Every structure is written in structure tokens, then in C-alpha cells.
């Protein structure tokens, strides 16, 4: 599958390449789509901020050790977070999908979130709630389940910003490693200052 060739690269490379890719979730009643505007790379056994740090396999992180293209879904502070596993089976690396520029199904997203505007999908737990994604998707294979990506119908960022990941204190050198990737100026990026907002259309080539 083409999408697996896309996913099974070096994790930081995949995290950058996913920016602008179309993401689709189809439940029983609604199709939700959008474009990825923010990702974070997690580099497995060596990465002190990663769930795969140290290589210990527990029931909660089993999906992280599966083949590239597996969905690793976990809950943090009641929010469901979605990661795409990268690399080969047994290497617990992945990309966290942090924010989405919504496209299709915005009305339903507004209902699911009780929000509208840029707050709708500008965070890793916000977009999953907007898309109505259940935790049961953990361990599923991307594009072989209700969640998929489309690398053919995508956008391309004008500028990609690299920075330290969000909420990673006290992890030594890993706290500030530039493993967070964002579309510069896109107002759906999490924690962006309003003074840095651009028209979303102006952030793509």
C-alpha cells in the first residue's frame, strides 16, 4: 500500500511529511476530514518522553510495538490521543497527530465538541473528540479501519516550524529537542498566539 511506504520512514521524516496530509474518519453516520497541521515525533526506546522509552512492553502500549501504520490510541487527562506507529514491528516509535485544519463535517464537529472556530480541532484531544473517534480504534491498522489518510489529495505547507514538544518537562535533552512540527501561521495549530495567526489558506503552497 502506498500509505505504508509513506509511513515506514524515519519517524522525524514521517512527522514532517504528514503535515498537509488529508485525514479521514468515517463513522456509521458521518464523514469527518481535515488536514494535519501539527505533529510530534516520539523516538522510542531512547526517547525519555516516549511511551516506548526503555523498551518495556505493557498492555497499554502493545500497539506501539506493532508494524508501521498501526494506530496507537491512548488517553491522557481524559483526552484521546492518536499516534501513527512508524518503522518496523518491535521498534516503538510513532507520530502524535496534534492538530487538524477541519474540512468536511464541520457542523457535526461543532456538535461533538460544543465549540466552533479555531478552537474546534487545535489540540490532540480536541480533534479526536470533534471527529468522534473511539478509544477502541487502538491497535487498528490505518486505512484498513474507519480512520485513514490520503496522501494523494493533500496540501503542502509553505513553511514548517520545528520546536520542542508540548508538555515534556524534566526529560533532560529530550525536553527541548525539536521534534514538534507545525504549519507556520496556521491558526489551528495548538497554543499559537493570536498575533501569529494567518488566514489558513495562506499557510499552504
Swiss-Prot record:
Belongs to the DNA glycosylase MPG family. The keyword Ribonucleoprotein does not apply. Keywords: DNA damage, DNA repair, Hydrolase. This is Putative 3-methyladenine DNA glycosylase. GO terms for molecular function: alkylbase DNA N-glycosylase activity; DNA binding. One of its GO terms (biological process) is base-excision repair. The keyword S-adenosyl-L-methionine does not apply. Its EC number is 3.2.2.-. Disulfide bonds: none annotated. The lineage of its organism: Bacteria, Bacillati, Bacillota, Bacilli, Bacillales. Gene3D superfamilies: Methylpurine-DNA glycosylase (MPG). InterPro entries: Formyl_transferase-like_C_sf (IPR011034), MPG (IPR003180), MPG_sf (IPR036995).
